[in-house]
């Protein structure tokens, strides 16, 4: 659901119907293919998580663009439409043995409506069996990164705050400032969104000083 194009979801995936691991069940007219609707209740937490993921995708047009990304700053925003990152910002470890990657979408290349730009989004994919740290690119002045999704919390996969407009995070949680190195647990995915700092906060003042210095980590 965070990839461009049509989401590759088959009926039942949203509530954990696995077909017992059979990836080619077209000829299985039996329990392998029959949807077990009891799983909706049994896996209600996962079902709710998928619903939030769908809502998040819908509210962020940068995640489903009609045209291919150029990876260039062709509008002079100071950021390309799409960029790749890793343990260092603006640099992807493309070695064949690497199992992690950071992807940043600049929401200014997409509109939520005629006037409002979409958000900056950073997606950290760690498919390795070990935890890794990702270096976060600096955001424009007056903004900070806030974690909105983590598939490896103590409670399991979570959205915070809920993407569909549910209860917002507490004021204390919203003020948590993620900077420089961002740890991602093994075999997990995290999503960060660029949020505006409150006027007069220390971060907002720091951001004004950094304006115009080009690409960097915070």
Where are these regions (language model features)?
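Carbohydrate-interacting/catalytic domains
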Residues: 1-9, 13-218
């Amino acid at each position: 659901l965070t990839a461009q194009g049509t989401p590759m979801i088959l009926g039942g995936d949203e509530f954990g119907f696995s077909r017992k691991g059979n990836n080619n069940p077209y000829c299985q007219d039996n329990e392998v293919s029959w949807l077990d609707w009891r799983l909706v209740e049994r896996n209600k937490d996962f079902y709710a998580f998928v619903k939030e993921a769908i809502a998040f995708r819908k509210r962020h047009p940068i995640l489903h663009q009609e045209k291919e990304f150029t990876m260039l700053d062709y509008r002079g925003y100071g950021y390309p439409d799409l960029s790749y990152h890793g343990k260092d910002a603006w640099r992807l470890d493309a070695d064949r043995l690497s199992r992690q990657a950071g992807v940043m979408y600049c929401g200014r290349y997409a509109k939520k409506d005629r006037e409002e730009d979409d958000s900056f989004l950073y997606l950290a994919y760690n498919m390795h069996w070990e935890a890794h740290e990702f270096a976060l690119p600096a955001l424009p002045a007056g903004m900070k990164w806030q974690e909105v999704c983590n598939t490896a919390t103590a409670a399991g996969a979570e959205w915070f705050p809920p993407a569909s407009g549910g209860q917002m995070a507490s004021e204390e949680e919203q003020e948590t400032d993620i900077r420089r190195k961002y740890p991602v647990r093994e075999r997990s995915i995290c999503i960060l969104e660029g949020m505006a700092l409150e006027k007069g906060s220390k971060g907002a003042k720091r951001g004004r000083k950094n304006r115009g210095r080009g690409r960097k980590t915070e």
